Each structure stands twice: as C-alpha cells, then as structure tokens.
Amino acid sequence: MPELPEVETVRRGLEKLVLNKKIKDIRVLYSKTIVNEESEFIEKLTNKTIKKIDRRGKYLLFRFSSDLTMISHLRMEGKYFVEPSTKEVEKHTHVVFDFTDGTSLRYNDVRKFGRMQLVKTGMEIQTAGLAKLGPEPKEKTFIVEDFSKNLKRRKKAIKNALLDQTIVAGLGNIYADEVLWMSKIHPETPANKLTEEEVKVLRDNIIKELALATEAGGTTIRSYTDAFRHSGGFQFSLHAYQRTGDPCERCGTPIQRIVVGQRGTHFCPKCQVVKS
C-alpha cells in the first residue's frame, strides 16, 4: 500500500501534469471505485477545472472549481497516469477523466480497492477515514507531548500503534519497521511502556524518515510508480523492512522477521530488545 511518501510523490507529479485542466468527459469503467452515485459524480465534475491537489495522510484531495473536492484513496495498488485521450485504455484502468486539451487522467488499480468520493470543499474532514486522522508527521503539527499522551493510553504493540492513523497520519508497514529500527525499539514493545526519551526519538525519526523517503520519490517494493511511471528510490536505503537475514547495519546481527498484528515485521533482535 502506498504510504505518505509515495502518495505525496504522486501528488507532486500530478500537480505538474493536470493542474488547471478542464474535464470534458468522465468514463467510469469500474463503478465500485466511485463512492457517490456514478451519474451524479460525472455530472458534477464535467466542465470543472482542477485548481489544486492536496494530501492528507494517505489521501489525495483534488480541488476543483465550484468548491468541489474529490477524495482519492489509492489503497493497495492504485495509480494515476496521464495519457492522450485517444490512446487505448490499459487493462485495470477504472476511471478516465478526459480533458478539453486532448489528454486524460487515468486511474489504474489491479486490486480494485481504491475509492473516489466527491464532496463539497470543506466537508472532506467529516468523511470516514479523514475525520479521525492524526497529525501530519511534520515539526509544527506532530507535537511530542500529544504523541506521548496517545501512546500512554495504549497497551498494544508500538508497531500496531504506529499503523493507527488516528495517532499519526501516513505511516504504513514499511516505514513503521524503519523508524522502529532507527529508534532501537522492539516492534512488540507495549506503546505505553516507552520512556519519554524513546517517544521523542521515535517522533523525530518518523519526521526525518518520511521526509527522506519523500525526497527519494518513495519506496518501490513490488509495483509502486509515480504519475510519470517512475519507480521510487528509497528501497535502496531501507535498514530493516524485507531485509530478513541481512546483517544489521549497526551491529551485524541478522535481521529477523516476525508477525505483529498480522503484519510481517522486520527488526534487529540485538538492537531492538522487547520490553515486557
């Protein structure tokens, strides 16, 4: 699943490709992608212009003229590409936005899990998923005191807590493993057992790691590509995720894989010792 760095990379690419383009027509090839009534979705967006593209956590927010916002969640395999409107539609393409300039924005999703929802701008914060999102992992918004209070209320494993989007927005399996390795925290450590210093280090590493991954264009493990069809570059900088058996870059101990909360989890058994 694309995490914050991948979604932000897609957002940046799309802003270069489709900003200020006007929709001429919309072709919905898989109706379940659209949360709204399909006819209403098409009618309301036809002749509208993309004015801006924002991101909140793992969600893309397409801002259209007439105060309309399309919420787009890529889920597992969702991708956006821009092609000439006359080009044959690729397999697994579910929605095509044809623009007046002869190009089209195409949503492609092998797994069919991605969704689009059209709302009045300002109402997106009340929709399921967005309503309870935690803070963005940035210096000004991700406050260590609030992070600490949230963790103190939770007995579950810190790995699971980091995947909880109400605590901090944008982390997924890849970067949760990475920031825990960086912070020398075992993924099964109860969240409420972390010291104040560990919480601070973890918070700082979350901000740092996601920023670095974003600048590298995200991480491509299997199929992720950005709007230009480019793979990410951060997979070459991973320390723990999917490095089972490789020596830890700090101590040389082989990285191990366990399952935490039904998620494959990678860590160093020497650097990251579990707390009971």
Curated annotation (Swiss-Prot):
Its cofactor is Zn(2+). A zinc finger (FPG-type) spans 239-273. It catalyses: Hydrolysis of DNA containing ring-opened 7-methylguanine residues, releasing 2,6-diamino-4-hydroxy-5-(N-methyl)formamidopyrimidine; 2'-deoxyribonucleotide-(2'-deoxyribose 5'-phosphate)-2'-deoxyribonucleotide-DNA = a 3'-end 2'-deoxyribonucleotide-(2,3-dehydro-2,3-deoxyribose 5'-phosphate)-DNA + a 5'-end 5'-phospho-2'-deoxyribonucleoside-DNA + H(+). DNA binds at H92, R111, R154. Binds 1 zinc ion per subunit. GO terms for molecular function: 8-oxo-7,8-dihydroguanine DNA N-glycosylase activity; class I DNA-(apurinic or apyrimidinic site) endonuclease activity; damaged DNA binding; zinc ion binding. InterPro entries: DNA_glyclase/AP_lyase_DNA-bd, DNA_glyclase_Znf_dom_DNA_BS, Formamido-pyr_DNA_Glyclase, FPG_cat, MutM-like_N-ter, Ribosomal_uS13-like_H2TH, Znf_DNA_glyclase/AP_lyase, Znf_FPG/IleRS. Transmembrane segments: none annotated. The keyword Lyase applies. One of its GO terms (biological process) is base-excision repair. The keyword DNA repair applies. Keywords: DNA damage, DNA repair, DNA-binding, Glycosidase, Hydrolase, Lyase, Metal-binding, Multifunctional enzyme, Zinc, Zinc-finger. Monomer. Involved in base excision repair of DNA damaged by oxidation or by mutagenic agents. Acts as a DNA glycosylase that recognizes and removes damaged bases. Has a preference for oxidized purines, such as 7,8-dihydro-8-oxoguanine (8-oxoG). Has AP (apurinic/apyrimidinic) lyase activity and introduces nicks in the DNA strand. Cleaves the DNA backbone by beta-delta elimination to generate a single-strand break at the site of the removed base with both 3'- and 5'-phosphates. This is Formamidopyrimidine-DNA glycosylase. It comes from Ligilactobacillus salivarius (strain UCC118).
